[in-house]
Amino acid sequence: MSTHMIDVSPATATGTSSGATMIGHGEEPQLARASAYFSALELFSIGIGPSSSHTVGPMRAARAFADHLAATGRLPDVTRVTCSLYGSLGATGLGHGTPDAILAGLTGLRPETCDPRDVRASWSGLAEGATLTLVGSHEIPISKSDVSFEPRTRLPGHPNALTLSAWAEKDGVPLFEETYYSIGGGFVRQSGDPIEVRPSAPQPMAYSSSKELLALCDTHGLDICDIARANDESIHGPEKLDAGLDAIWDAMHACVETGLHVEGTLPGGLGVKRRASGIRVQLEKLDRPPEPGHDNATEWLHAFAMAVNEENAAGGRVVTAPTNGAAGIVPAVGHYYLRFVPGANTAGIRRYLLTAVAIGSLVKANASISGAEAGCQAEVGTACAMASGALCAVLGGTPRQVENAAEIAMEYHLGLTCDPVGGLVQVPCIERNAIASSTAVSAALLALNGDGTHIVSFDTVIETMRQTGRDMMTKYKETSEGGLAVNVTVC
């Protein structure tokens, strides 16, 4: 499996919708967590839209399933592959392009390297008598009915679950079957895998809480980005890390630029028009000096975020940050830094990304970054905390000011539901990213105006978010069964 076969202690959803059925494989084993830190090259993952949990994760699961069939010599015997989508995947998978992603993964495509155009309509465009070539070498018949949607069936490992089954001719039982959980941010694990954080290598600056992270900064006289760099260099080495960070930023920048220059209507049937390009045209006409505090700084920030999320909604190339639904915030605030902060440079962007990862890792390790598990507070709230703390850092903030900025940003989003209209990552997702980008900047500036002393710690707000997600009703967690999803008329 890929490095994305990793999990953390999830928030257990207790508020289920009526009629839901729990099935599965018993309790997952819980192992001790050595460190909260996830590599920047894992938490930031180049992929495709519109969803890290419903598109990127399922594609990785399907590719892993097909690879296993090939590696075990079963591939020549396979005559059919079926897939069952459970819980949130079953509820909103159609709008998120999950079946398309699964078929693309079975053919051997990877979200990191595929052409997004090769994924679109893989399933939805199937004609009668269609065939599928498993990992490019074994052809089988395929039909839309081979993918089933079971939103009322919830497996205990995670709300986002799917089971892939390979069948041989005339056999009444699967030749091979595996259940996967798409746990947010493109991370996937198999049923039976231990719920744990598994660092790729021993980390010299391991920490499991913001309290421990700040203590490391105090002890060694380092900034948060230095702690992150030490851990990441122990995994990848300095050259690979810097090359990876630069590639991540290049992908973020390319996504912003594409989104700023494309017009039209987003797919899916809601009739949502792209707005980032129009905002860019208006701002360029204003021709104001690009300085912080000028009226157009906030407008540019909104345009940057919307550009990313419009590209994501169209199934384009995006970077999970830490998810696709919240992918616009970290790039938008990074572009704000480069455009409006004197002296901003590439080295600053690397510090920005590393600080963001150190913050996001804490949330992933101690709560969740999955909207299906804890609502939009886990996605947009986490991304806002990452961007706010990271901006505070590159503006000269101390580690305690950085932690304060992250806490303010996350605190603001507590209780935010995930209620996508029509099961699409468009309404309210695109505008939420724009406003959360503004919130990230405001929280960073507010923290910089203090000395880092505050009542609520980032650890406390993470735990509060976890508890809130646990208590949140399932209909508000990426099922499109509540909130705006049922109150907005879809024609």
Task: Annotate the PLM regions.
Residues 53-70, 331-343, 388-396:
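Alpha-helical support elements that line or immediately flank enzyme active sites
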Residues 87-129:
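Glycine-rich nucleotide/cofactor/substrate-binding loop typically near the N-terminus or early
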Residues 344, 355, 361-434, 446-455:
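Hydrophobic alpha-helical bundle architecture
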Residues 111-289:
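C-terminal regulatory domains involved in ligand/effector binding and gene-expression control
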Residues 455-491:
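Extended hydrophobic packing segments that form well-structured cores
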Residues 236-375, 483-491:
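Accessory "access/gating" subregions that flank catalytic or transport cores
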Residues 33-48, 64-65:
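N-terminal signal-anchor module of multipass membrane proteins
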Residues 44-62, 314-333, 376-385:
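Conserved phosphate/anionic-ligand binding catalytic regions in large, soluble enzymes, centered on
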